[in-house]
Amino acid sequence: EALKSKFITRYIVSTDDEEIQQVAIQCGAEAPFLRPSVFSTDEASSVSAMQHAVAWVERQEGVEYDYIVELMCTNPMKTVEDIDASIEKLISTKADSVIAVHQLEDHHPARIKKIIDDKITDFCIPEIPESRRQDLKPEAYIRSGSIYALKRDYLMVEGKRYGSDNSRPYILPQERAVNIDTEIDFIIAELMLNK
């Protein structure tokens, strides 16, 4: 889907794995480097890996890009319409970033609890006991991790993908907010993609 975008001019895959690098190239992306191990640990941030990729490409080619779009491979349900709408919103609103989010339906923050001394208590937002999902307000959203469209300098200078007063949402429908973190997530995504 990403290759169909009317905005994206380069598709760079950042990986530390040679097999993934070859698959990326076979699928039409560029993978001109292997990411250094310092940016590939469990402690490394996505931002540091993105900054490395942008700096590497800009240094090699002597160019500076205006916008950077991160499309996470663990979120395979996004469409070219989602990608382009995020970029259009970034440009038209002059936002620092536009990130994909989806509405929390049955997992509203008011339903989050903590256990202290074997007793359940509200985590941060009080829940009215026996409240129905549709009664929980305000509507709550969570980052889907699917699309991060950013001004280049917001990433490279500020070191962020979101969080400024000028970060905006792109609301993904629930069915396109699949995030693969576990084997069960993978099975669900595979079923949906084969549907």
Q: Predicted regions: what is each one?
A:
Residues 1-14:
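N-terminal glycine-rich phosphate-binding loop and ensuing alpha1 helix
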Residues 7, 27-29, 116:
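Short, structured coil segments at secondary-structure junctions
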Residues 8, 63-65, 92-96:
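Short, high-confidence coil segments that cap the C-terminus of an alpha-helix
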Residues 15, 78, 149-151, 172, ...:
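A conserved hydrophobic position in a structured secondary element of the catalytic/binding core
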Residues 18-69, 78-81, 85-88:
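Short phosphate-binding loop-to-helix
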Residues 48, 76-166:
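Conserved core of the sugar-phosphate nucleotidyltransferase
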Residues 71-73:
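Active-site acidic Asp-centered loop
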Residues 169-195:
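Hydrophobic helical membrane-anchoring modules
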